[in-house]
Amino acid sequence: MLSYETNARIQELRDKFENIKTTVDVDKIKEKLSRIEKELSDPSVWSDQRRAGKLGQQAQALRSQLDLLNKVQELFENIDIAVELSEEDESYLENLNELLKEAEDMVKEFELNILLSSPYDAYNAYLSVHPGAGGTESQDWASMLLRMYIRWAERNNYKVTTIEEQPGEEAGIKSATINIAGPYAYGKLKYEAGVHRLVRISPFDANHRRHTSFASVSVFPEMDDDVEIDIRPEDLKIDTYRAGGAGGQHVNRTESAVRITHIPTGIVVTCQNERSQHQNKATAMKILKAKLFELELEKKRQEKMKLMGEQKDIAWGNQIRSYVFQPYTMVKDHRTNYETGDVQAVMDGYIDDFIEKELLFFASIDEDKE
């Protein structure tokens, strides 16, 4: 006979899945998928490779939702069979526990899939990191955050492309922007935007004192070309400069790197990874468009955080998460109150629990879907 704990675990998992299912309109998902597949079957759509790629990405995301739903339902059927067998023969209990663990992981994944249902959640993401005041220490912290997100992206099998990276004078980075490509990259990362605080004994302090450093993270969706954003030429200041890595590595002899300032908002974007000034300008304009679009989304949602190219006042006031290395180890999100003592795992990109808690938190306060 199954223990009370096992029965309660099964019932809790089943109730959670049924509650999530009530938020899913399967017919609507199938209808949308059918419409996209019909469009993709038209040979003319492939004349625009970018649009075809976006449609393919949307179709992949919808199929993923349907496949996951079917897999979880099949898993519960197998659990029911395992329960019957376990009541007759306790040797089947191990198999039942394995199925329950698999079901818990799948229900968690399904829940995230449903939470990521805003129109732009399925898009690729741009992610920028900027250090706060504090020189080398904060610049090193910014590079640690950048590494954390790259590791997270790699663990999710996302493609990471560096758009621009300006190395610090002694260590770390002065700024960096990367593109993270994959299903729901933006939806998963959008609430990572904000100020991240580090407390540690600085390796750059000869007296080994404890330092507090800040760095800001901005996240914005990679927009389709057909999304219209009004950008007036007279509102732009465009500068060019020589691109190159730290220590004079791979220095470009021509001024191919581009910096664009959007004067009305103060947003600044740079790009130096392309081969020509023309390509860098095109990429920078695309990023500017994405930032302006995200800024409008933020205003509509009436959220406190604002995504700006130049992060101002990166300090205590608007921090979202603290990372404490000494005198104890803890990472704590100040919005959800979720925390863990395994700082090293977090810095190695294991931040899915934080992302899940963020999505649940903002869903619980009934954030308006765009």
Swiss-Prot record:
It comes from Kosmotoga olearia (strain ATCC BAA-1733 / DSM 21960 / TBF 19.5.1). It comes from the Bacteria. Keywords: Cytoplasm, Methylation, Protein biosynthesis. SUPFAM superfamilies: Release factor. The modification N5-methylglutamine is found at Q249. Methylated by PrmC. Methylation increases the termination efficiency of RF2. NCBIfam families: prfB (TIGR00020). GO terms for cellular component: cytoplasm. The lineage of its organism: Bacteria, Thermotogati, Thermotogota, Thermotogae, Kosmotogales. This is Peptide chain release factor 2. GO terms for molecular function: translation release factor activity, codon specific. Its main location: cytoplasm. Signal peptide: none annotated. It is found in: Cytoplasm.
